[in-house]
């Protein structure tokens, strides 16, 4: 192969990976293009609790809300639980249902791996919804959190707040 051809191929490959890096570095908003922070409804001043969140969670939000993360013993206004297994989900939710008694306005987002992620999980939207309904919560919204994660929003029904 001649040098100009090799140089051209190298230039194309390096441009491709630079472009791929730029795309992957952008905040993920799912299919709608709506910023994740808006999809989740995170409000300024809310106390946030994250459980099992991926390392790049704050980058997905497109706004820095890391200062709103509350200490473990504080009663949060917003919880985002990332669960890989049904067992982990049920263990964490048993604690969160108790917090709903102290803060009936609590917003709980539960995220699980999408089928398209290729990750093994026994947790599904139906499992989450069934647990919520059996424990006095209702689901009011679903969204794509990232390319790998879906999310279901759970709250105490208005009549019980």
Regions found by a protein language model. Give the residues of each.
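Short acidic low-complexity segments
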Residues: 66-76
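Mid-chain, well-packed structural core segment of small domains
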Residues: 92-123
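Class I S-adenosyl-L-methionine
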Residues: 136-161
């Amino acid at each position: 192969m001649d040098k100009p051809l090799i140089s051209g191929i190298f230039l194309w490959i390096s441009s491709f990976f630079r472009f791929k890096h730029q795309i992957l570095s952008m905040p993920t908003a799912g299919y709608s293009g709506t910023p994740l922070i808006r999809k989740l409804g995170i409000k300024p001043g809310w106390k946030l609790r994250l459980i099992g969140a991926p390392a790049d969670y704050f980058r997905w939000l497109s706004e820095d809300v890391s200062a709103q993360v509350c200490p473990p013993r504080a009663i949060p206004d917003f919880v985002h639980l990332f669960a890989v297994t049904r067992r982990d989900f049920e263990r964490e939710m048993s604690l969160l249902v108790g917090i709903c008694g102290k803060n009936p306005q609590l917003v709980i987002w539960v995220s699980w791996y999408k089928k398209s992620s290729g990750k093994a999980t026994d947790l599904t939207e139906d499992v989450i919804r069934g647990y919520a309904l059996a424990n006095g919560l209702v689901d009011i919204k679903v969204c794509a959190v990232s390319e790998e994660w879906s999310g279901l929003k759970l709250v105490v029904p208005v009549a019980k707040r």
